[in-house]
Regions:
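Divalent metal-dependent catalytic cores for phosphoryl transfer on phosphate-bearing substrates
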Residues: 1, 20-133
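Short, Lys/Arg-rich amphipathic segments at extreme N-termini
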Residues: 1-19
Length: 133
């Protein structure tokens, strides 16, 4: 389901998440699992992501409906639960909210949110595009 770049990014996020979890006292195992799986549906066709969300009963607000780049967090948490059998709410919520954040985020949610933007691959990619930024 993941291309080479996405897999490498996810491995880096998992490593960063584990380090952050250790530093801040979050569950390192959960952080590593959520980190490796956070983008599981990112490369899935948008129509398929939307169908997964709709089939699960999630009702998208107007902003979410018109922001398909946000869908992979929601669809990813559903796929992880339904296809991989992971039912840990901390892990599922960390995946679901890793792009948007939310009020009252748990420590694990904050760890994954932060790790996604501070992982080595992400920083290197931004550095390679710094003229565009």
């Amino acid at each position: 389901r993941m291309g080479d770049y996405r897999f490498s990014h996810s491995v880096n996020v998992a490593k960063e998440a584990k380090k952050l979890a250790k530093h801040y006292g979050a569950d390192e195992n959960k952080a590593e699992i959520a980190g490796i799986l956070h983008d599981i549906t990112k490369e899935m066709p948008k129509e398929q992501q939307l169908q997964i969300i709709i089939d699960s009963g999630i009702i998208l607000d107007n902003v979410q409906l018109h922001a398909p780049k946000l869908w992979h967090g929601m669809s990813g948490s559903i796929v992880v639960r339904d296809e991989l059998g992971i039912d840990d709410e901390d892990i599922l919520n960390a995946i679901r909210y890793h792009t948007t954040g939310r009020a009252g985020m748990s420590l694990l949610e904050k760890v994954i949110f932060t790790a996604d933007f501070t992982s080595e691959a992400y920083i290197q990619r931004c550095g390679n595009n710094e003229k565009e930024i």
